[in-house]
């Protein structure tokens, strides 16, 4: 591989991981980014290019960071020159290291991270070494060096380029699908196909489990419902949101493909697991008003799911940057669970138009949204931040948005 010249587009966390991996293999790495600062601070690249410069000659293949669109000019230039384009997922799956031991992967529109982290916790609590990686936070090219079962969260961005078969996964799961990232994929069909591409990564096609009958694979709903009934019988368990219960049962089903983990171990893991923040995170109550941080709800379907668990007196804070979806499909859930909506940010007016049949107040930002919600609230009400939008109009991430909400509520200091 020493003579290969490889372009890496985007030098954020994943891009730097890609560049480091390739440099360690003796590859000549050509780095591309819109930021000169990012180029200057990546020590793994031999040639530096701003993205408005011309595509170089003598390139063997291109690796794009997951967030880099297929419409990026350098990606299009590579395609026009018949140069292979891939993401870190395909790069990892090509390595011999990925066939050495058990590897599981999960994708879907909602619930991926909670399911992945619970699966990792379930394994470790059962004495089975495991490591979560991929879209969950640790880039796959870094995480695959760790011992134990590999548990990979894969996004549609990472599967969009999947054309070849890389049969490395001993188990896989597509949790669900609904409109998301249509601004990136262009349409639902492209988004759906990206998710279905997980099938190309299975060692045995029979070990791909799916939560929607439109996908190719084993429909797992009956199995998951069996485990949900098991949890329902456990009166000692703390109350669980329906979607959390569903995610835990999906993880257990996937774990049992390779490992005989007992139902008792599963129940004990559910009882002791702390799910990640910003996912229907109950912050407490002030003057009888309850607060929930669901900043991770960046899609309409995620907010619909959230509304199933907030009773019928919710004031819902929506808004941010739209990901190509319409908000009118929220109306049935809002009518059951909410008394009003506060719309904020870049697409606030669009939300107000889509929900014109429902009480909506338009504000500029999160601070104003919380003040407005508190003015409307009475004891017993629930104020829930469940935006149904990306955060990038006013924040760097959904985590930053959620941390700011917690700070504004007065439940936690925020470090930005």
Curated annotation (Swiss-Prot):
Source organism per UniProt: Chlamydia trachomatis serovar L2 (strain ATCC VR-902B / DSM 19102 / 434/Bu)
Record pathway: Cell wall biogenesis; peptidoglycan biosynthesis
Full protein name: UDP-N-acetylmuramoylalanine--D-glutamate ligase
Record keywords, A-Z: ATP-binding, Cell cycle, Cell division, Cell shape, Cell wall biogenesis/degradation, Cytoplasm, Ligase, Nucleotide-binding, Peptidoglycan synthesis
HAMAP family named among the record's database cross-references: MurD
Family: Belongs to the MurCDEF family.
Keyword set includes Lyase: no
One example GO MF annotation: ATP binding
Gene name in the database record: murD
């Amino acid at each position: 591989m020493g003579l290969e010249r490889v372009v890496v587009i985007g030098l954020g966390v994943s891009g730097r991981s890609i560049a480091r991996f390739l440099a360690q293999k003796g590859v000549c790495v050509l780095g591309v980014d819109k930021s000169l600062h990012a180029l200057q601070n990546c020590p793994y690249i031999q040639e530096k290019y701003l993205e408005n410069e011309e595509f170089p000659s003598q390139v063997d293949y291109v690796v794009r960071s997951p967030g880099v669109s297929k419409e990026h000019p350098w990606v299009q230039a590579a395609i026009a020159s018949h140069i292979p384009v891939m993401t870190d997922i395909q790069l990892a799956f090509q390595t011999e290291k990925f066939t050495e031991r058990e590897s599981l992967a999960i994708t879907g529109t909602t619930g991926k991270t909670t399911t992945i982290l619970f699966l990792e916790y379930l394994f470790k609590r059962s004495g089975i070494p495991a490591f979560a990686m991929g879209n969950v936070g640790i880039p796959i090219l870094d995480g695959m060096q760790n011992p134990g079962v590999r548990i990979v969260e894969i996004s549609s961005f990472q599967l969009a380029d999947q054309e070849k078969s890389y049969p490395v996964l001993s188990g896989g799961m597509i949790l669900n699908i609904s409109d998301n990232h249509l601004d990136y994929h262009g349409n639902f069909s492209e988004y759906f196909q990206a998710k279905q591409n997980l099938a190309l990564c299975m060692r045995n096609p029979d070990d791909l489990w799916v939560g929607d009958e439109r996908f190719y694979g084993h429909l797992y709903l009956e199995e998951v419902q069996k485990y949900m009934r098991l949890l329902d019988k456990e009166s000692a368990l703390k109350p669980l949101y329906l979607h959390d219960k569903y995610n835990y049962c999906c993880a257990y089903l996937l774990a049992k493909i390779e490992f005989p983990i007992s139902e008792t171990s599963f129940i004990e893991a559910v009882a002791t697991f702390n799910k990640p923040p910003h996912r229907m995170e109950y912050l407490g109550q002030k003057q009888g008003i309850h607060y929930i941080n669901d900043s991770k709800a960046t899609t309409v379907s995620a907010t619909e799911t959230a509304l199933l668990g907030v009773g019928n007196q919710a004031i819902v804070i929506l808004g941010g940057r739209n990901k190509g979806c319409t908000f009118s499909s929220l109306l049935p859930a809002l009518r059951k669970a909410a008394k009003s909506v506060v719309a904020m940010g870049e697409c606030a007016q669009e939300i107000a138009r889509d929900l014109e049949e429902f009480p909506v107040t338009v504000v500029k930002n999160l601070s104003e949204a919380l003040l407005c919600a508190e003015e409307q609230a009475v004891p017993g009400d629930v104020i829930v931040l469940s935006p149904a939008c990306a955060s990038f109009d006013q924040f760097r991430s959904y985590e930053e948005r959620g941390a700011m909400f917690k700070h504004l509520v007065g439940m936690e200091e925020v470090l930005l």
